[in-house]
A protein has these predicted regions:
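Intrinsically disordered, low-complexity regions
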Residues: 1-227
């Protein structure tokens, strides 16, 4: 029994000495042969808002827009409570876009007017205001409220020029052209589309080419119907 106890004590002492030798910052031998081990504590904490966003995006991808909207709303509330106002505004615009997709124009409008725009005005985000104007232009166009749509697309274009954002400016030109097509102002719409083509080429924005072609096709079809 005594021999066993002594053996155990010797084993523990030996291992303790080896451990001390390995981690000793003053050991010259170890300094040259062993890499320094720095244990970095990586935070894996995910906020409740981020979790809601992940679930919302999954629901959206699965086609469950109502479920996605509900989760996006929860995420928006969390971001607002955490004072992450840019994220809060972005989620609000996302909610509005999904409501627009559901043709729920009134609620889509209210989300932007009563929440997103107020948020961006409060934090002084002109870019956020510009994107809010774009969303309202789209909502009013879909709801056939063309005067309101024209006004917001125009405001979007003004801000885009001030912020030197050619992509968003081109988007506003196309939005206005689509309104003029719907109002059967075909000559004016044709001029806007020609201008849009020139802007896309000058600003190297080929991603708008397909949209321009679609608008031109609609213009041709509608103008033939008129004649």
């Amino acid at each position: 029994m005594k021999r066993t106890a002594l053996t155990l004590v010797a084993f523990i002492a030996c291992n303790w000495a080896m451990a001390q030798n390995f981690i000793s910052p003053n050991g010259a031998e170890n300094a040259g042969s062993q890499p320094a081990i720095n244990i970095a504590v990586i935070s894996t904490k995910v906020s409740n808002a981020d979790k809601q966003m992940e679930l919302a995006e999954f629901n959206e991808q699965m086609g469950d827009l109502s479920g996605a909207i509900s989760l996006y709303k929860k995420a928006a509330e969390e971001y607002n409570a955490d004072k992450k106002y840019n994220k809060y505004g972005s989620v609000l615009l996302k909610i509005s876009a999904l409501l627009l997709e559901q043709e729920n124009y009134n609620e889509a409008e209210q989300v932007v007017l009563k929440s997103a725009l107020k948020n961006y005005s409060k934090i002084g985000s002109r870019n956020g205001q510009m994107l809010s104007y774009n969303m309202l232009g789209r909502i009013y166009f879909a709801a056939n409220k063309l005067t309101q749509s024209m006004w917001f697309y125009t405001q979007q274009g003004i801000l885009a020029q001030q912020l030197n954002n050619p992509s968003i400016y081109l988007d506003s030109v196309l939005g206005i052209a689509d309104i003029k097509i719907k109002k059967k102002e075909f000559g004016l719409a044709s001029k806007d589309l020609l201008r849009a083509e020139e802007l896309a080429k000058a600003s190297n924005l080929p991603q708008y080419n397909q949209r321009i072609r679609v608008s031109k096709s609609i213009l041709t079809e509608k103008s033939k119907g008129k004649s």
